[in-house]
Amino acid sequence: MKPLSWSEAFGKGAGRIQASTIRELLKLTQRPGILSFAGGLPAPELFPKEEAAEAAARILREKGEVALQYSPTEGYAPLRAFVAEWIGVRPEEVLITTGSQQALDLVGKVFLDEGSPVLLEAPSYMGAIQAFRLQGPRFLTVPAGEEGPDLDALEEVLKRERPRFLYLIPSFQNPTGGLTPLPARKRLLQMVMERGLVVVEDDAYRELYFGEARLPSLFELAREAGYPGVIYLGSFSKVLSPGLRVAFAVAHPEALQKLVQAKQGADLHTPMLNQMLVHELLKEGFSERLERVRRVYREKAQAMLHALDREVPKEVRYTRPKGGMFVWMELPKGLSAEGLFRRALEENVAFVPGGPFFANGGGENTLRLSYATLDREGIAEGVRRLGRALKGLLALV
């Protein structure tokens, strides 16, 4: 019998598959006593456990033959209608996906070939980098910070390159927590429209704003201008539950058709029971739920910022988010976030080093903190521990 060589059997794309750094780090943070700022996990106290149990039983009792059957790839019609009303589009423009991660995977399959240029912020969402990398593209990056991407740098890149699409997170970006101001959104969109480019706008955190009102999305601004080139990705993970894996994409019919066809080859459709459950949970009291979600995250963000102001040495810089789930931290040049991570684990606190959020490398002195899963007391104690680790690292310089 000839020995089997798995590496010979794998396709070229398998060589591009990399483990999620966050998923691997989460394994290290599971030991007892660890306070974790690592995973971008929503606050578990917001999960509607009792309501979900009652709604699931009701769906199975009254519509079980529908919930347990195959369904159209585009999604459960009442949920598509709900999304359409929420976002301000027509139901036929909506595709329900199995989480936003699937939407990113579908976008990569539809738009990218090996060597295709695709533009991302640096840093950007690690899951998007992971999804797009499967297609073997060429990553173009522009610096991003507390007020979104550097538009002067973006303009310079667009003078010499024509990316297949720009992947952007204008509202409460993962990992920086940055919020692109309205004038910058308009300038960015003007650059895109002048060149006839596609934008993939990931708006998973759209409702997690701490101020009085939500800024209009690039998608909304483009629609007002009559421009069809923005593909809009949204999710129920942050406002309801990530475990249900229900999200959506909104796009021009020509683009949506290709995404639907790609989804047919991936999983046929998002689980019908999950779609029906999301619709049942949100068809009443949605506004009240969003207000509670915003209040919880606002209080947690305030708790983290108060603790950071108290515990973190002045040489260390960090963002002050206006929404979302993350604080982005920058150590003095020459210091390593991975070195800090090892010290932090000794103090029983964890975070995510920033390097993996940079598609083309860099960011060795950066890190992401999530305030979503711990309560205010846990946040304060976790930051105390992080402060000790930081002071220990800085003492070596």
Curated annotation (Swiss-Prot):
InterPro entries noted in UniProt: Aminotransferase_I/II_large, Class-I_PLP-dep_aminotransf, PyrdxlP-dep_Trfase, PyrdxlP-dep_Trfase_major, PyrdxlP-dep_Trfase_small
GO molecular function per UniProt: 2-aminoadipate transaminase activity; pyridoxal phosphate binding
SUPFAM superfamilies to which the protein is assigned, alphabetical: PLP-dependent transferases
Recorded metabolic or biological pathway in which this protein acts: Amino-acid biosynthesis; L-lysine biosynthesis via AAA pathway; L-alpha-aminoadipate from 2-oxoglutarate: step 5/5
Keyword annotations from UniProtKB, A to Z: Aminotransferase, Pyridoxal phosphate, Transferase
Modified residues (N6-(pyridoxal phosphate)lysine): K263
Spans traversing the lipid bilayer: none
GO BP, sorted A to Z: lysine biosynthetic process via aminoadipic acid
Cofactor: pyridoxal 5'-phosphate
Broad enzyme group: transferase
E.C. no: 2.6.1.39
Binding-site residues, substrate: G40, N174, R368
Residues annotated as binding pyridoxal 5'-phosphate: Y70, S100, Q101, N174, D202, D203, A204, Y205, S235, F236, S237, R245
Reaction(s) catalysed (UniProt annotation): L-2-aminoadipate + 2-oxoglutarate = 2-oxoadipate + L-glutamate
Family under the similarity heading: Belongs to the class-I pyridoxal-phosphate-dependent aminotransferase family.
Function: Catalyzes the transfer of an amino group between 2-oxoadipate (2-OA) and glutamate (Glu) to yield alpha-aminodipate (AAA). It can also transaminate glutamate, leucine, and aromatic amino acids. It also contributes in the biosynthesis of other amino acids such as leucine.
Oligomeric and partner information: Homodimer.
Name of the protein described by the UniProt record: 2-aminoadipate transaminase
Organism: Thermus thermophilus (strain ATCC BAA-163 / DSM 7039 / HB27)
Upper taxonomic lineage: Bacteria, Thermotogati, Deinococcota, Deinococci, Thermales
